Amino acid sequence: MKTFLLSIVIVFTCSVWAVGQNNRKLLPELLKEGSIDTYGLEKVSGGKTLHWTATRQGASVTFSSGETAWDFSPFVHLVCEVQNLADHELFVECHLDGDYWSTGAGYVPARSTKKIETLILRKEYSKQQLELFPKMNGLPGGATRLWCGYRPESIHRFSLDFPRIQSGDEVVVKNVVLTIPYKEYSGKEYEDLLPFVDEFGQYVHSRYPGKISGVGEIVKADKREEQDMKNYPGNKSWDIYGGWAKGPQLAATGHFRVEKYQGKWWLVDPQGYLFWSHGITCVGGGDETNVKGREKFYRPLNLPASVDSSLFVSERNDRKELSYWKLNMYRKWGADYKTKMIDKANRRLKSWNINTIANWSNEEVIRTRKIPYTAVIHTQYGHFIQDPFSPEFRKGLERTIAGSSAANDEWCIGYFVDNELGWGNNTYLATLALQGRYPYAKEVFKNRLIEKYASLAELNTIWGSEFATWEDWMKNDSVYAGATNDLIDFTSHMANAYFRSVKEALKAKAPHKLYLGCRFNYGDFAGNAVQQWIVDIAAKYCDVVSFNRYTYSAYSLRPSKDRDFPMIIGEFHFGGLDRGLLHGGLRYGGSQENRADLYKHYVQDAVMNPYLVGTHWFQYNDQAVTGRGDGENYQIGFINVYDAPNWELIRAARSVGETMYELRSK
């Protein structure tokens, strides 16, 4: 076999693309005052053109500011222009100050150039901004916040990472520019901004493709979509459940199950066909925003006085929540819009090659039993598990499952139980028990210690404590340095008890349904040494272990060494800022074209991962300009505020769904 090596060349030049007057060219500062460190890159030339050749698979370059930190706070984006000279595409990821959340990414096609946009996050908002724009995560003027660990006025470094680069590939990275001026509104400028949401739920002060100005345009968009779905009703190689009808047929049980087939984990549908779960969450809802106390943000809805506002407005807990999405469906379909929404949601998903209605979706859509779905049970208090040793924990689970219509429904794939629990480190649960959060668990902890230690004096020696009686131990809430091993042991015992109880409850009340796990939070838990302990425990009880994984790829998600179990992505997304919303989501995608491209690659990577049996995008709708209850106002939907598709993402989903079974079976 002949091997061809393509060289990687990274070149920084001082020529820049056309930049606005308020943009800042960062490259001259880099070359004059900053420092550059590389990993897996070899410098081959000097001067103002910086040129490296990759010497290994996976490489990166880090640019540091020097003695004085950079001030990125006047800008919204850091933009790097990347030219790929190789004969295959190149993945590029940018990080600001090494922060997990502040990233930008893109796939640069072979022999092409692409601009990689990185969103400059704000660590916190001023008191004035919080008062002027309450309960909004993204604000007018370019302010977006997540859990970033840096301050934009003091940036010390940023990196460009090439995790899939091969030794010898060539790339030119040129023109580093800070773009789009950042602005904070106050005084007259703030007053002039108001109202900033129009009668259709769109941001007033921006122009973008697809923005409407009248009801007629909503109707026109609906007709266009109907014709599109007529042209593409769905994948003809799928069976009624979305399984691979043209593929092998395994044992049919009448329900979904999981099986390892030819070295890869698969779901198997009720008819025995291989099934890979290509899904979307929150189908049929998820755009409500509280208008009470913020009335000045919104233009009048311009509706007749006779309109029944309860069709799109709900009032609860001192909140008045308006769904512009429902209002706009009312405008095009009338009072019976819900019936048409349910029908269209089912036809849409099939047309988009989506075969799973994922978490938190509308029960009325699910009950049509036209597309497989996942069910969800919540036992948690915030991010805390319930006390797994409480008698009510198991009883409550069984009552909830028994009352669920999904328990015996062949269209239900399985149950997620809880979401993004706070597991902490491997002593966390025992520490909470010791401190009194879990009284039943604390009693069990005491009894295990009584069995382990010959006497309380022996425990005191190990822990460095001075308990006179076990009653004293029960009253104590202090954590002693010598207790670490016992805390580790009991944390494991508690976690086992939690997952075991859920598994047994599902087996008792929904024996044919899969236990899909607890949707581990955000990062790459598998492979993370700090958190691997809890993933391995979950895998003993879950039929499929789930991760809400907001990264740019799912390919590297693997069980720990010597483990083998199926996994599923419960949430991921890539957001944009080019369609009138004010926040780019938990993973920024930039333009609609780029976020669609990121979607396509993410799902294809997951399809090729032998352990993954599905990906579920969060979420069906774009969120509201002024945000949901916790302030999320992300442009992350498959559809926009007036119920029209975000076409770039639709095309990406169709493309992936058209070939996913053939790709996975290779």
Please give the residue ranges for each predicted region:
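Active-site-adjacent substrate/metal-binding segments within catalytic domains
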Residues: Y203-T368, G382-E410, M474, Y480-A481, ...
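Polysaccharide-binding and catalytic clefts of secreted carbohydrate-active enzymes
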Residues: P270, I280, R294-G334, D409-Q532
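Active-site clefts of carbohydrate-active enzymes
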Residues: E321-N328, H383-D387, M474-I488, F520-Y522, ...
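Aromatic-rich peripheral "rim/lid" segments of glycoside hydrolase catalytic domains that contact
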Residues: L432-V444, F618-K666
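Substrate-binding cleft of secreted/luminal carbohydrate-active enzymes
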Residues: E410-G414, D418-E420, L586-I639, I650
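Short carbohydrate-recognition loop motifs
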Residues: G40-S60
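Extracellular ligand-binding interfaces
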Residues: T53-R145, D169
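Glycoside hydrolase catalytic-domain groove-lining segments
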Residues: D489, H493-G585, K600-V607
